[in-house]
Every structure is written in structure tokens, then in C-alpha cells.
């Protein structure tokens, strides 16, 4: 009787255990931590070129001049750990120095920025185990569209948001408190939508929208929790500042970028495993229904 009761308690957990086992096997086989380390290295190499290209695009449109300042502050306040101010100062110095580069150097910056997008594309298709290859021209067109249209669309959305916030009817107390609540979850929503687009568009195979939404939601929640946990760790355990002094920002930035990519790739693994788990259950049911006829 006791064993039967325990079986009834464990039976709802069995799908979760099976899914967790499949997810762990996939993560181990794909070498998630090594892939995250590769992307972290490429990200640090491409960080300054990518930011330079993005804010050069904003500079080309006068309407985005004020928005670019707000966007920069928003990114470092919501997507970087506690040392975001220091990192922002260093990156602004690097970007200012890059303005004196020649045409050849500028082309090199663009190529290096595209390298990050190419690396993300390659790693995600490794996780999806896709053998389909895009043509070089098509791939370059997609990378260039992401590099150029992405920042412009973000800037346009912030222009619209600023316009809506300036309207007089939004000054009402109840509406104002509602806007505060929306702005509080805005970074989470941006992360969710960004991860969903990443998992849906980048792989060269068809990805079910529901799986991509679930994987993106888990990644977005982990990203928000990881950001707060990392900031707490840096504040409460300042070992890097004690050891490295002024240079502490370098290992802290690398750790944060590496941790971020671990979360992004974990969301991708969850998205893939959801499809595999569903296929496994469908196969098990078909075998069960056919066995009596045998």
C-alpha cells in the first residue's frame, strides 16, 4: 500500500525527471560550457566594434541623437552587473578613439562585429544539429540586416515610447503607476522577445513557436535572476577588486559575458529538448498502441 501511494506521488514527477535527464544528456553532449566560453571570447573581441557600429548608425539619424544616450544608459543599467558604470566609461573611451580610424580600420570593425553574429549562428545550429547550410550571400544579408535594422528598430521603439510618455493624459496618477509597473518588467520583456527571436530565426531548421517561447521565457527569467545574483556577489564578495585592483573590471566583465552566454545556450537547449521530448512521448504512445495488435 505504501509503495502504491509513493508511486502515485512520483508519477506526476516522472515526465519532469525524464525531461531533465534528456536535457542534461544534451547539454553534456553538446559541451554547453565550452560553446559559451567560445562565444564569450568572441563577444569580448567584438564588443567595442559592435557598439561602435551601432552608435555610428544612431549618429547617422539626428532624430536618434537623444535616444542613443537614453538607450546606452538603459542597456548598462538593466543588462550589466553592478560594475556597469565603470565598463560604460571604458567602452565610451574606446568608441571615442575608434572615431579616428581610417576606412580600412572601419571595415575591419564591421567585419569583427559581424564575426559575433556569425559565431552565434554557428553555435545555435550546432545545438540544433542542423546540417542545412545557408548561402554566403543570404547569410551576409541576414547578418547585415541584424546589425543595421536591429539598433534602428530599438531606437524607433524608444522614440515612440518617449512620445507616448510625453502625452498629457498619461500624467494621471493611476496611469502613471501602471507605467511604472510596465517599465519595471520592461527589461524582462525585451530579453524574452530577443531570446524568442534568436531561437526562432537563427536556426536553419523549423522551430515550433511554443517551444521557442518557453525556452526564451526560462532564459529571460534566469538572465534577470543571474543579473541580480551576480551584482549581489560582486557587492558582498569583492575578491576580484582586492586581487586585481583597478583591472578587476576585466575578469568581472568576462565572467558576466560567459554567464550570460551559458543562460542563452541553456534556453536554446531547453527549446530543442522540448521538441525531442514530445517526439519521444509520441513514439512511446505509438509503440504502446501497436503492441496489443502484435
Curated annotation (Swiss-Prot):
InterPro entries assigned to the protein according to its UniProt record, in alphabetical order:
UPF0761_bac, Virul_fac_BrkB
Q: Which UniProt keywords apply?
A: Cell inner membrane, Cell membrane, Membrane, Transmembrane, Transmembrane helix
Which residue windows are transmembrane per the record? 44-64, 67-87, 108-128, 136-156, 185-205, 212-232, 246-266
Q: Where found?
A: Cell inner membrane
Q: Which Pfam families match?
A: Virul_fac_BrkB (PF03631)
Q: Name one GO cellular component term.
A: plasma membrane
Where does it mainly reside?
membrane
Keyword Hydrolase tagged: no
Give the membrane topology, semicolon-separated if more than one.
Multi-pass membrane protein
Q: Does the record bear Transmembrane in its keywords? A: yes
Identify its protein family. Belongs to the UPF0761 family.
The cross-references to NCBIfam families, in alphabetical order and at most eight, read: PRK01637.1, yihY_not_rbn
Q: What is this protein called?
A: UPF0761 membrane protein YPO0028/y3801/YP_0029
According to the entry, what is the taxonomic lineage of the organism? Bacteria, Pseudomonadati, Pseudomonadota, Gammaproteobacteria, Enterobacterales
